Regions:
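C-terminal substrate-binding subdomain of Rossmann-fold SDR/epimerase-dehydratase oxidoreductases
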Residues: 76-179
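Short beta-strand/turn micro-motifs composed of small residues
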Residues: 12, 48, 117
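PG/GG-rich flexible active-site loop of Rossmann-like NAD(P)H-dependent oxidoreductases
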Residues: 15, 51, 121
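NAD(P)-dependent short-chain dehydrogenase/reductase
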Residues: 28, 32-91, 95-103
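Short aromatic-enriched loop/helix-cap "lid" or pocket-rim segments at secondary-structure transitions
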Residues: 22-23, 57-62, 126-129, 153-155
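Short, electropositive alpha-helical surface patch
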Residues: 22-30, 133
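Conserved Rossmann-fold NAD(P)-dependent oxidoreductase catalytic core, especially the SDR/UDP-sugar
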Residues: 1-25, 40, 44-45
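Short catalytic/ligand-binding loop motif for oxyanion handling, primarily in non-cytosolic enzymes
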Residues: 17-19, 55, 123
């Protein structure tokens, strides 16, 4: 209760910008609690990363690239009906790149809220093409697919003007190819 912390670094999530997203709602509550109690810290640093991918990932999340990987390479399914639209776009960043930037900025003695993401977007259709090239080579088949939605969604750090944005310098396509 009476503990004085010099620097609090909180890893939040870009899901705080989405309506009714379970993780986003809880991450935002945590952010608000930290901000309300910021006098307990000399410096408060909040990070909101977008679509991070690690090459040594052992757990698959519910993100599209992970779901697609699971469907093609683990389940070896030949057809999938997706909820979204093939024109949906995302900006992917490497966890390794994010960690380097996090270390650099976190060493500064100042408070901030930063978004981290990749303004270089890749479409869901292009992600499927990349995975299909690999599956064709390694498994001898490509995934056939359809999408339910006519409306497309663009999830980009570039759409945010509210806070400081720090951008990945790597193309999303390159990040996906090295997943």
């Amino acid at each position: 209760k009476n503990c004085k912390i010099k620097k609090m670094i909180y890893l939040s999530s870009s899901t705080i910008y989405q309506k009714n997203h379970f993780i986003g709602i809880n991450k935002l509550k945590a952010e608000k609690h930290l901000i309300k109690n910021k006098l307990k810290f000399k410096y408060l640093q909040i990070w909101r990363p977008f679509n991070l991918i690690g090459s040594n990932q052992t757990q698959l999340t519910d993100h599209f690239h992970n779901y697609l990987f699971k469907v093609i390479f683990l389940e070896k399914r030949k057809f999938v009906l997706f909820n979204g639209n093939e024109s949906d776009k995302r900006g992917y960043s490497s966890i390794d790149e994010f960690v380097k930037i996090l270390q650099k900025y976190s060493s500064k003695n100042k408070s901030f809220i930063n978004n981290f993401g990749n303004p270089n977007l890749i479409s869901v259709k292009d992600i499927i093409s990349i995975y299909n090239r690999v599956s064709n080579k390694k498994l001898g088949f490509e995934l056939n697919h359809k999408f339910k939605s006519k409306k497309f969604n663009i999830n980009s750090v570039k759409n945010l003007n509210k806070r400081k944005n720090i951008y990945s310098k790597t193309k999303s396509e390159h990040v996906i190819e090295h997943f």
